[in-house]
């Protein structure tokens, strides 16, 4: 699905996603880094609440995020869906059987997840980290790089900053009037 910054933001903004992490998977190079990725692919790890979001919903978002019929030549950006369990692999197979895609025409690889190496801190929540006001708020709240990476709020805000699923005023609880007093705020 290309560079992991975009999918990190897109999935982070999805209702039901708890956290996202970017990293490297699918290769044999020991301890991959961005500078020495070897045969790994940039990957996104998504944790979600199954009470609010199904695995099929996650797959829908993944397959809508790229053209699964397109073969990407560069290993770093290949289209791969990694499955962590046999149940996920079976669900993915059923999803593809029920989809509009011709299985023979799908270039997106499906592989078991053999390992996931976290990407460097500057890649985590990249869009959010590009906004000084946001990083200042998290830093002042005592967050370090690992806390930011693991934060559900940071995952969501990273998506909003990148322009995904931005809530409207009603979803934010902002009233329809032009005055803060009408929203129950003291002037």
Where are these predicted regions, by residue range?
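Flexible coil/turn and secondary-structure edge motifs
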Residues: 1-187
């Amino acid at each position: 699905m290309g560079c992991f910054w975009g999918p990190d933001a897109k999935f982070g903004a999805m209702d039901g996603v708890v956290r996202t992490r970017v990293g490297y998977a699918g290769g044999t190079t020991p301890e991959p880094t961005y500078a020495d990725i070897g045969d790994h692919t940039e990957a996104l790890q998504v944790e979600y609440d199954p009470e609010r979001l199904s695995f099929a919903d996650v797959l829908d978002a993944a397959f809508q995020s790229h053209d699964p019929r397109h073969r990407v030549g560069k290993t770093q950006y290949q289209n791969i869906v990694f499955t962590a369990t046999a149940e996920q692999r079976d669900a993915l197979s059923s999803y593809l059987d029920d989809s509009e895609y011709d299985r023979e025409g799908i270039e997106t690889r499906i592989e078991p997840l053999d390992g996931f190496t976290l990407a460097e801190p500057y890649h985590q929540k990249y869009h959010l980290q590009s906004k000084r006001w946001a990083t200042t708020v998290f830093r002042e709240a005592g967050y370090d790089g690992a806390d930011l990476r693991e934060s559900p709020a940071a995952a969501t805000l990273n998506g909003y900053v990148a322009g995904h699923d931005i809530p409207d005023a009603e979803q934010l609880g902002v009233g329809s009037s032009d005055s803060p007093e009408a929203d129950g705020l003291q002037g």
